């Protein structure tokens, strides 16, 4: 009796799961290429884990919460680690629509890959497009980064304006360079008229150049 029941179940599974069957998906793994010397052997334990991950993904779909590991069937398993699988309905002997299975796999693709230490290129669902990895969120909000950059620019601009004002004020306080030195040099210049040295006229003190005094003016007492 048990042998007959086992044979019946096997026959039903063979009818539901076979290459290119309705709602069936092919999976291909490249364990050696992904892990190198740390590659593991694909055995019945790995098959059980795969079925568990598919059942887990299906239980996330509305109205598919009753999906169990036994509802995930594998067939045509090869040594190069490729196989086909289908997901059967819990109450009836038919496979679930491919669209539901595909949606469930896509939503949990990262979880399935992580379970086998693989990625979308080394664990391939041939009829299911690869999903993009979620974008990395920066640890610091973007608006804080933008605010910090603007604040630094404004601070540098204010500092440059203050330094420029201080330099300009110092230049104004000193006045034009060389003016006082030129005046001093002009006062000390001694001119020569007709071979007679003449002192410049001191306009400030009313000094008279002796070179232009007559003999009477020089001898006339004050």
Curated annotation (Swiss-Prot):
One biological process term in Gene Ontology: positive regulation of amino acid transport
UniProt topology in membrane: Single-pass type I membrane protein
Expression across tissues: Expressed on the apical surface of the proximal tubules in the renal cortex (at protein level). Kidney; collecting ducts and proximal tubule. Pancreas; beta cells of islets. Expressed in the cerebral cortex, hippocampus, brainstem and cerebellum.
Changes after translation: Glycosylated. Glycosylation is required for plasma membrane localization and for its cleavage by BACE2.
Phosphothreonine modified-residue sites: 214, 220
Site feature: Cleavage by BACE2: 125-126
Claim: Signal is one of the keywords in the record: yes
Cysteines paired by S-S bonds: none
Family according to the record: Belongs to the CLTRN family.
Protein name: Collectrin
Organism of origin: Mus musculus (Mouse)
Lineage of source species: Eukaryota, Metazoa, Chordata, Craniata, Vertebrata
